A protein has these predicted regions:
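Specific aromatic-rich, kink-prone transmembrane helix
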Residues: 10-13, 49-66, 71-79, 98-104, ...
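Extracytoplasmic
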Residues: 88-89, 136, 266-381
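Perimembrane helix-loop-helix junctions
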Residues: 92-123, 244-247
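Hydrophobic alpha-helical membrane-interfacial segments at the cytosolic entry of transmembrane helices
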Residues: 109-133, 207, 252-265
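Membrane-interface alpha helices of multi-pass inner-membrane proteins
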Residues: 33-37, 71-89, 93-98, 123, ...
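Membrane-interface transmembrane helices that cradle and orient dolichyl/undecaprenyl
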Residues: 16-22, 56-72, 82, 108, ...
């Protein structure tokens, strides 16, 4: 995957800019590549927006680390693309960066850096508005469909955060917290030595890393998808490695523990979540029952077919799908295909005119009785 490569190379580049040995940069980046995109066969919007948001975090901390204006230019552009991919967790991580940026510029005012950030923002806004204009998309439709309705969904999702139990927030994600422990120790130690460290670039960098981690944990608790944020372990371990070498040079066994933590967690989650397709709810499915997907269509050649609907008899599901596809193919009228089998239109090489990407309750589209249902219905009628 090109995007997995970009995310991996961004991790490598960022760690390398912190003067971590190239071999370790490669090591941690490789583990990120294993845990990131492979967690789902087809990455969801949650994946894409999360990885873009973390790249934006890299951009922010590199802006502080290198003092280069170019990173302030790209920061709003990356965040903008991430937000248009999916609103959350981009929104939460964006607020963290805005908060830290305000602190940074209060104590390190630099008109040149601010100007570069404004230019990047204006370029993104201009391109965005141009796309709306070319696509004849009213700004009001964008606000209703992409901002207001998702916010109404988010109101219900906030309930998923509670109760705020130690088990749910810390024990469930204990390896993520362990990988960031050195960062937390460094921050507390330096603040105790001198409270002015709170405005230091290094503290802002550590805060950005830990803050974005908690934002991802909160996001993970609010969504109904499988866990996918364990790619943060090698990233946090890599930065822990950087700051451990800087402040604790005498006890090298901690470095070995970080490496062991990264390898063991990658092996565990790679097997339990990626190999077993836990994200797709296939962890209890016997893959020996899977059939060659090209039986359904040659475009699926090279893939194996099995789902949670027919785990013991995938052939029956394929036969039903073939029957349905033949009926749809013989109907020459313009039609809307309402189905969770989103690849049908690809097989038929036709547009399905579906009003929704997903057909799930509560979160995919406004249902009857929802305050935005009339807007949703009138859009298509």
């Amino acid at each position: 995957s090109i995007f997995n490569f970009l995310f991996t190379i961004s991790t490598f580049y960022t760690l390398h800019k912190f003067k971590l040995d190239t071999r370790y940069c490669f090591f941690y980046s490789l583990l990120v590549a294993i845990l990131a995109y492979p967690s789902a066969g087809t990455p969801y919007g949650d994946h894409q927006s999360t990885y873009l948001s973390i790249i934006a975090i890299f951009c922010f901390i590199l802006a502080l680390r290198t003092n280069l204006r170019i990173f302030w230019f790209f920061l709003p552009i990356i965040f903008g693309i991430a937000f248009l991919t999916k609103q959350a967790p981009t929104g939460q991580i964006f607020l963290i960066v805005v908060f830290l940026s305000i602190i940074y510029f209060i104590f390190n005012f630099n008109l040149g850096k601010i100007t570069f950030g404004i230019i990047g923002s204006l370029i993104f806004i201009f391109i965005f508005l141009a796309i709306l204009k070319i696509g004849k998309i009213p700004l009001s439709s964008f606000l209703e469909q992409y901002i207001l309705f998702p916010l109404s969904v988010g109101e219900n999702r906030l309930e998923f955060l509670f109760p705020l139990e130690f088990k749910r927030i810390f024990l469930r994600f204990k390896l993520i917290h362990l990988s960031s422990l050195i960062l937390l120790i460094v921050a507390i130690k330096k603040v105790k030595e001198n409270y002015k460290y709170l405005k230091h670039d290094e503290f802002l960098i550590i805060f950005a890393l830990i803050g974005s981690t908690f934002a991802l944990i909160a996001h993970q608790l609010m969504i109904i998808n499988g866990i996918f944020i364990f790619f943060m372990i090698p990233i946090l371990a890599g930065f822990s490695h950087v700051y451990y070498l800087k402040y604790f040079k005498n006890k090298n066994y901690i470095v070995y523990l970080l490496i062991f933590l990264s390898i063991s967690s990658t092996a565990y989650y790679g097997y339990e979540y990626i190999n077993k397709r836990n994200f797709m709810d296939l962890n209890k499915v016997n893959f020996k029952n899977a059939l060659d997907a090209k039986i359904l269509d040659k475009k699926l050649s090279g893939l194996k077919w099995i789902t949670t609907l027919y785990p013991n008899n995938p052939k029956k599901e394929i036969l039903k799908l073939q029957e349905a596809i033949n009926i749809i193919n013989k109907d020459n009228r313009n039609k809307t295909i309402a189905t969770d089998y989103q690849f049908i239109s690809v097989i038929l090489s036709s547009y399905d005119y579906s009003p929704n990407k997903y057909w799930g309750e509560y979160h995919a589209y406004p249902e009857k009785g929802h305050k935005y249902f009339e807007i949703y219905r009138n859009f298509f009628i």
